[in-house]
A protein has these predicted regions:
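Alpha-helical transmembrane segments of integral membrane proteins, especially early/N-terminal helices
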Residues: 2-7, 49
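Transmembrane alpha-helices and immediately adjacent membrane-cytoplasm interface residues
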Residues: 46-104
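Hydrophobic alpha-helical transmembrane segments of multipass membrane transporters and ion channels
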Residues: 41-45, 49, 169
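Cytosolic-facing loops and C-terminal tails of multi-pass membrane proteins
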Residues: 2-3, 70-95, 216-294
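N-terminal signal-anchor/start-transfer transmembrane helix
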Residues: 6-26
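Loop-to-helix transition at the N-terminal end of transmembrane alpha-helices
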Residues: 29-43
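Polar-ligand-bearing catalytic/cofactor-coordination segments
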Residues: 22-27, 81-167, 179-250
Length: 294
């Protein structure tokens, strides 16, 4: 019974956290939402994957055919999760290599590259030297000077806060645990909100206008690659409404501590589940192969 509770805990945690995720995310300042959602997703994914492997090793040691068959199913699920994660990682690597083509173009001293393209778009290309902000003439020609500056500040915020890393961490976590798929939208919206607030430091009204105009112009533009951060077009209304209101309050410590506690508990579960795997596959000297926690 203790083993069942131990191995099912991360899946129950994933279900509860996913159910309450929008409400929980709202308790964090935009600057905190992205890293908190990302690292919680990674922690849940690792914990749930380790529980799959532990469950497989426990069931494989059963004498009944049903137990061994169930163990095989869990093993296949764990292997499939790894394959999906590796496949996504390869897609990300391909996208990163494709983005290097932008770095070969000339740019101004501010790290902004304007492409002669009628399709309106703006995105950030990460790089070791601080990255690159790419705009198309289709977008810049439709914006005022202040709105262009707001869009550039927005994209720079993505680079500064390394949102691409956090977004892809959640994407990988969702490949390992499909219950985390809704987290991908949440982290992308959080990244946009964080960048919006950074751009709004000069003028919230101008930032709201830039977001609304850019969202309207770019609504039909297909994201260029898997690393694109932009959320759903429907998120633009939420972002504009947030920018037309007061700036977010300072982050409360209790929410951060609560998130840290959840991550700590799940990390402990991963350790204990790993101990179950070790007990079954390579029991210590003097320890019965059947020994399991509890």
């Amino acid at each position: 019974v203790n083993v069942v509770i131990l191995l099912s805990a991360p899946w129950l945690a994933a279900a509860v956290l996913t159910w309450q995720l929008p409400r929980l995310a709202s308790r964090f300042h935009p600057d905190w939402q992205v890293p908190v959602v990302a690292w919680l997703a990674v922690t849940v994914a690792v914990s749930s994957w380790v529980s799959l492997v532990a469950g497989a090793t426990v069931l494989w040691n059963q004498s009944e055919f049903a137990g061994r068959a169930a163990g095989s199913v869990l093993a296949v699920a764990a292997a499939a999760a790894v394959l999906l994660a590796v496949r996504h990682a390869r897609n990300v690597r391909t996208s990163v290599r494709a983005n290097r083509a932008f770095r070969g173009h000339s740019r101004d001293e501010t790290g902004v590259l304007v492409l002669d393209d009628d399709r309106p778009d703006a995105f950030a290309v990460p790089g070791r030297s601080g990255g690159l902000v790419v705009l198309t003439t289709g977008l810049t020609d439709a914006l005022t000077a202040d709105e262009r500056r707001a869009v550039i500040d927005h994209e720079r915020a993505h680079l500064r806060h390394r949102h691409h890393v956090h977004v892809q961490a959640v994407e990988l976590a969702a490949r390992i645990n499909p219950m985390l798929r809704p987290w991908c939208h949440v982290v992308r919206l959080a990244a946009e909100r964080c960048a919006d607030e950074y751009a709004a430091r000069r003028d919230r009204r101008t930032a709201a206008q830039a977001v609304a105009r850019a969202a309207l112009l770019c609504a039909r533009v297909v994201a260029p690659d898997v690393c694109h951060i932009t959320g759903r077009p429907s998120d633009a209304r939420v972002r504009v409404m947030a920018l037309t209101g007061a700036p977010p309050e300072r982050q409360r410590r209790r929410a951060v501590l609560a998130a840290g506690l959840v991550a700590l508990v799940l990390s402990g579960q991963s350790y204990l589940a790993g101990d179950v795997i070790q007990d079954r596959l390579a029991p210590e000297a003097g320890e019965s192969p059947a020994t399991v926690i509890g």
